[in-house]
């Protein structure tokens, strides 16, 4: 595979100056380059590159469409792209009249342009919009998703907490959490397990989830087999063991994952369509005469209506309004979401589990209406839900009803109905957002599936779940209002929750208010809450929080440092309650140390406590520690978290892991940072694990060698990859590990050697280039016995420099 380097690009840049224009520059200057080819023939100016096989990033109209292999033939044959590849790239081929399956680039771009950028391993295609199957920006077609490699990984967090009181009573608690995975043959085995050991008690292991997973791009879905949790798409989530097939909404473009209206109209001529929201242009596109549909809008969360204008070729403008509000479960027209489950419940603490089937389906019918429904079926329980969501000019509203039937083991049957209404609206004029949700349980006999299981268990085993599980819900109402104030006067939010129960006389109520703002660097928040329990017992609380950040250093000449000073004061209806003052900051050359110090004072027991916490991030682990002390007690705690990856290329340890990550491999390059993470650097082998990967989306991976002292040369520091969810992607960077040498040399008459000519070893292998000022640059595994430099390339005249197993970079050599 042919590669070039940034160093080579600099040589070419120097060579482009007029003073060197008369030289014929040989491409042997490329370390490992191709013999006998001239730079004038290499065509860095967007002409056909040298023959060979290349792995390139393909960009269509500046949008990444994947990484593909391409073969450049010997001149004068022109390069072509297979029809299959063009289809993958989203370029239409139906109108290309050719019997050959390989289409010349000149024809493939439909009158557009193509541009080679071999130094970046990239081919840019500019194709008229009419011949492109458009992709939403940032979205990657399924054909380019990466399944990853086979690997085993585990991430863990181990912690211990210890406390003593004034009576010398102590308590120690230990805890461990392990998230592991095994990826084989495009399937992934996921495990989430924990270990806990309270003081003076036996430790216990608990498995939370254990399941196989596989993504199917053909149906944009994922299948899971094992112990997991159902979704809360329509019914409440519960733990189960079985099989689940669901639409993975992250496989869809962002605009299709939730409700966005279709913008439709008719253009009378070549027209410019402009879509605005809140006065800002969010979409603009030229369309030909005739009907048009815009389905790839990426809207803000404001929920405000869309202003659409059609500017015709004669400058006439027509405008119309498209209502836009959304509630949960609403989808774009034509988009569906589904979730199917078959299995057995596995709720903790319940001895009698049940087999069940669950099916959920949502479909966006049009800009106005979304329909949804679901059902749960078991031997002794069934429930069905039907609902709809409406997008109206007055706001978005949804309504659904659920009918349930629960037959208990004592032959008593409970049947009931619940109703749910939700409403959202954003007022553009005042920037007010408010939402209301209400639940009504028409009778005390309504049961969820979890209610049914717990109640059966209570009957069978005389268990008492009343303290933590309640089947007496009757009515519930919640409301939220968020209001930004004009002239940068801050933000206000209000919320209320009201609920009551069957068989109880009282109502529970919660009210909350908050105001937040900032002045220069200082931010502050005032909050107030009031709550009443079912016995009308009142509790009031007020809080004032202030945060002041301090910065110094520009992260260029000096390391940037940051400290935050904060204070939180609380009051109750009886007056002052507590105060907490703290300092937090980040330190270290690589921002690896986080620290905090605080003082807390409690009015109720007239107690003051002092505390501190530290977090140290290393390339292989994150270590946390905390300590606090008061007159009545002291506590200390510590934890360590890390990750381990075993793969065909070795074993890597990292400070954190998610279930979708990448192993970057730049052989021999030590100390390079990945994507600005100063604490995450390549190891001695040039490998580093990066875990902030977004499934099914472009992930740009950039290695920064600015602080690396490695002599290994990185040839191209950027890669792009789009992994499946749960994939372990392997991303290889090209490096040159040969040792670099700089040699000052002159001709026998003392004149400089010709800039840009090759440097060969005595076996005539290309090992370097003549740089500016007659300075030679070579890369070799071992010091050669001698080197050859061309004096006159056309006449095949060379001079030679010999070495006695040593190269003195401070010496000026004479090329004989």
Range-by-range predicted roles:
Residues 180, 340-349, 357-375, 385, ...:
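Core alpha-helical transmembrane segments of integral membrane proteins
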Residues 65-78:
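Short acidic/polar beta-strand-loop edge motifs in secreted extracellular
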Residues 16-18:
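N-terminal signal peptide c-region/cleavage motif recognized by signal peptidases
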Residues 3-10:
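Sec-dependent signal peptide recognition
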Residues 294-305:
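Extracytoplasmic assembly/pore-lining segments of large envelope/extracellular complexes
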Residues 23-54, 65, 84-89, 96, ...:
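Flexible, glycine-rich linker and terminal segments associated
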């Amino acid at each position: 595979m042919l590669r070039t380097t940034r160093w080579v690009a600099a040589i070419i840049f120097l060579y482009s100056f007029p003073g060197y224009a008369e030289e014929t520059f040989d491409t042997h200057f490329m370390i490992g380059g191709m013999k006998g080819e001239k730079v004038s023939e290499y065509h860095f100016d967007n002409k056909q590159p040298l023959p060979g096989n290349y792995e390139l990033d393909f960009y269509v109209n500046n949008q990444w469409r994947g990484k593909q292999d391409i073969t450049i033939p010997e001149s004068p044959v022109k390069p072509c792209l297979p029809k299959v590849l063009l289809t993958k790239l989203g370029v239409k081929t139906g109108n290309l009249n050719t019997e050959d399956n390989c289409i010349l680039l000149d024809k493939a771009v439909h009158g557009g342009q193509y541009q080679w950028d071999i130094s970046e391993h990239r081919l840019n295609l500019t194709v008229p919009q009419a011949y492109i199957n458009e992709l939403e920006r940032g979205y990657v077609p399924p054909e380019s998703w990466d399944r990853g490699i086979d690997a085993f990984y585990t991430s863990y967090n181990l912690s211990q907490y210890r406390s003593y009181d004034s009576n010398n009573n102590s308590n120690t608690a230990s805890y461990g959490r392990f998230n592991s995975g095994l990826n084989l043959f495009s399937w992934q085995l996921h495990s989430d397990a924990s270990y806990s050991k309270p003081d003076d008690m036996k430790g216990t292991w608990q498995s939370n989830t254990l399941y196989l997973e596989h993504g199917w791009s053909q149906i944009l879905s994922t299948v899971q087999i094992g112990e997991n949790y159902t979704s809360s798409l329509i019914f409440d989530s519960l733990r189960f063991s079985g099989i689940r097939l669901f639409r993975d909404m992250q496989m869809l473009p962002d605009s299709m994952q939730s409700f966005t209206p279709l913008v439709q109209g008719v253009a009378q001529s070549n027209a410019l369509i402009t879509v605005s929201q809140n006065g800002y242009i969010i979409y603009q596109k030229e369309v030909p005469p005739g009907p048009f549909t815009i389905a790839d809008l990426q809207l803000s969360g404001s929920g405000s209506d869309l202003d659409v204008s059609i500017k015709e070729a004669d400058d006439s403008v027509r405008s119309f309004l498209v209502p836009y509000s959304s509630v949960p479960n609403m989808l774009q027209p034509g988009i569906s979401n589904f979730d199917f489950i078959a299995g057995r419940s596995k709720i903790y603490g319940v001895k009698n589990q049940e087999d069940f089937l669950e099916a959920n389906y949502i479909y966006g019918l049009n800009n106005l209406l979304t329909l949804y429904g679901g059902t749960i079926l078991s031997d002794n329980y069934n429930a069905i839900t039907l609902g709809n969501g409406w997008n109206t000019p007055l706001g978005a509203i949804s309504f659904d009803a659920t009918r349930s039937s629960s037959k208990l083991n004592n032959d008593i049957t409970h049947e009931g109905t619940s109703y749910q209404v939700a409403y959202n609206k954003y007022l553009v004029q005042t920037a007010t957002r408010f939402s209301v949700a209400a639940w009504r349980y028409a009778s005390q006999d309504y049961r969820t599936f979890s209610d049914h299981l717990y109640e059966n268990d209570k009957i069978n085993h005389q268990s008492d779940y009343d303290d933590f599980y309640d089947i007496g819900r009757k009515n519930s109402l919640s409301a939220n209002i968020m209001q930004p104030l004009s002239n940068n006067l801050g933000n206000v939010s209000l919320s209320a929750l009201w609920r009551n129960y069957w068989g109880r006389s009282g109502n529970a109520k919660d009210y909350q208010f908050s105001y937040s703002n900032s002045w220069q660097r200082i931010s502050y928040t005032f909050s107030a809450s009031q709550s009443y329990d079912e016995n009308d017992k009142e509790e009031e609380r007020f809080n004032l929080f202030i945060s002041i950040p301090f910065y110094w250093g520009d992260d260029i000449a000096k390391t940037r440092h940051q400290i935050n000073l904060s204070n939180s004061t609380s009051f109750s209806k009886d007056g002052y309650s507590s105060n907490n003052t703290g300092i937090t900051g980040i330190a270290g050359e690589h921002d690896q140390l986080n620290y905090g110090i605080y003082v807390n004072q409690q009015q109720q027991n007239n107690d003051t406590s002092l505390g501190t916490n530290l977090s140290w991030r290393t390339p292989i682990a994150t270590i946390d520690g905390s300590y606090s002390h008061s007159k009545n007690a002291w506590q200390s705690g510590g934890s360590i978290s890390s990750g381990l990856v075993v793969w065909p290329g070795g074993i890597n340890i990292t400070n954190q892991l998610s279930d979708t990550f990448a192993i970057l491999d730049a052989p021999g390059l030590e100390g390079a940072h990945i994507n600005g993470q100063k604490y995450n650097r390549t190891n001695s082998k040039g490998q580093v694990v990066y875990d902030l990967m977004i499934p099914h989306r472009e992930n740009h991976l950039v290695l920064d060698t600015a602080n690396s002292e490695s002599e290994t040369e990185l040839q191209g520091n950027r890669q792009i990859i789009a992994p499946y969810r749960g994939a372990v992607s392997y991303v290889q960077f090209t490096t040159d590990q040969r040792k670099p040498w700089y040699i000052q040399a002159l001709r026998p008459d003392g004149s400089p050697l010709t800039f840009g000519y090759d440097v060969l070893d005595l076996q005539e292998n290309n090992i370097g280039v003549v740089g500016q000022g007659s300075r030679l640059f070579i890369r070799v595994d071992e010091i050669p016995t001698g080197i050859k430099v061309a004096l006159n390339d056309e006449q095949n005249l060379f001079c030679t420099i010999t070495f006695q197993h040593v190269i003195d970079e401070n010496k000026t050599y004479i090329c004989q």
